[in-house]
Amino acid sequence: MFALVYAIATPVLALSTGRFRRYQLLVCYSIVFVLGNLVMALAPNFQVLFISRIVLGSVSGALLAVGVTYIPELLSPQQTSLAISVVYGAFSVAMVFVTSIGKFVADTLDWHVAMYGTLTFAVLICGALVAFMPRAGQTDEPATFREQAGLLREPSIITGMLIFLFGVGSVYVFYGYVTPYLEQVLGMGTVEASTTLMAYGVFCLISNILGGWIDARFGMKALLVTFVLQAAALLGLFAVGGTMPLALVFVFSLALLMYLFSVSCITHFMDVARSRHPKSMVLASSVEPMAFNVGISFGTAVGGAVVSSVGIAYVGAVGAVFSLVAWALTLVTIKLARWERKRTMAQA
């Protein structure tokens, strides 16, 4: 539910708040984010906890999207890709590494303790954002719904979002069920599985940073190699079954490949916005969280269907097919982006 609300609310808020200044949005989203975490920590029952998660899902993507728009203004073009990769790397590691820590704390102490830890981080980080981010900038000019929505009609933006749908979906067919995979297929205990997930998170961080380095040097064309390797890793999981330690080699290889494509797609979205839709920079930075979380929901749903029908051992094979679809979409996006650049130059 969190991922679904996140995916829907992020672009909706970007489109509907274009008339407000960016710093005002940053403050408002930060306040709601902290209050959502406070309610979650104090939740007396599951119903209140569920509502707090919906509130958090509704502003988390918007807060991330607004924050990312500061990066091109604070850093040089050469540093932007790496900075974006660090931001999304931290986000990705939180989904894997910190989730494992939270699960461990909840299992050994109490789930409220884990929520208080989350609240503490929320207060510290949001406080730092509000205190140190510039009050004004290039993206503060008011924008109407129509001025922003034009970005979503660009063909290469549409295919770029589909890259996320199938690229993220290919991994989450497997990763959505990684814990039962580790325990049922590889025969790990609870502690071993948690340790493996923490190591997986470290590889995910490396994946994001490496993705920034690759994007700065090779751009989107590097994804044509990335998705072939990702398909190979997923097929490897299917082929080796529960054979240890070979299966772990493919698991960690997949973690290393998992986010290599993210920065290149984000850079593409923001480049298109900067060159042809300059008032839609916040929306451009919202596209990734939206598409990413739709990909999570899509991949997890397909993975669930696979697990309940043919069995968890087949998630790798299905994920590999999605990786190849993402490869084809990357090729189309590269060609469309080239055509759009030529069209823009001709109109200049």
Regions picked out by a protein language model, each given a short descriptive name:
Residues 35-39, 47-56, 245-253:
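Paired small-residue
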Residues 119-138, 330-333:
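C-terminal membrane-cytosol helix-exit motif in multi-pass small-molecule transporters
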Residues 46, 52-91:
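Cytoplasmic helix-loop-helix junction between adjacent transmembrane helices
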Residues 8-46:
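Conserved MFS/SLC helix-loop-helix module at the cytosolic interface between two early adjacent transmembrane helices
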Residues 21, 42-48, 59, 76, ...:
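Helix-breaking motifs and short loop linkers at transmembrane-helix boundaries and internal kinks
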Residues 9-22, 208-219, 307:
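Helix-to-loop junctions at the C-terminal end of transmembrane segments
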Residues 272-310:
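A late C-terminal transmembrane helix in Major Facilitator Superfamily
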Residues 157-198:
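Extracytoplasmic gate region of multi-pass secondary transporters
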